[in-house]
Amino acid sequence: AYIASRNELRAQTIRGGSVAEKMCNLTKQVWYNTIYEERDSITDKYTRSGGVFHDDFNTSLSLLYAEDNTATVISGLQASRELVDGIMADLQNPPAEFAACYEAADSLYDAYCGLIDLAVSPSGSLKTYSENFSKYDEDLLKYYNKLEALIPSE
């Protein structure tokens, strides 16, 4: 059961992480394009009004996050987070032979939560947002792969 829960953790974090990654990339693109007045067929509906770029990137981000599709994505990410939280609760206090697995799972969980948080509620400057996004995105893949290597076959 413990190995099955670990495998479920890996599956859910990579699935949710992939959705969060797409949302973070779009957020970063909207943010950047507003500041640097870059036209783009994907972001123009958020970055411009009446053919003119918004003076404040927060206006653009507010338009992005007010969109129905974004609300659906955010809702899905929050549901994913609740599911992963439950899996992590099941994995606490591992048997001794799974201690290293649990450490990797905990690191995977931290990266996953960081990525979800950035996707759901962007904050900071474009620079810090981009740096945090890169770190969590890289860490998610690193610990996903590490956990795979540590999981013994059932």
Predicted regions and their residues:
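Amphipathic, heptad-repeat alpha-helical segments
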Residues: 77-99
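Extracellular/lumenal glycan-associated context and N-glycosylation machinery
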Residues: 69, 73-77
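C-terminal amphipathic alpha-helix
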Residues: 2-67, 97-154
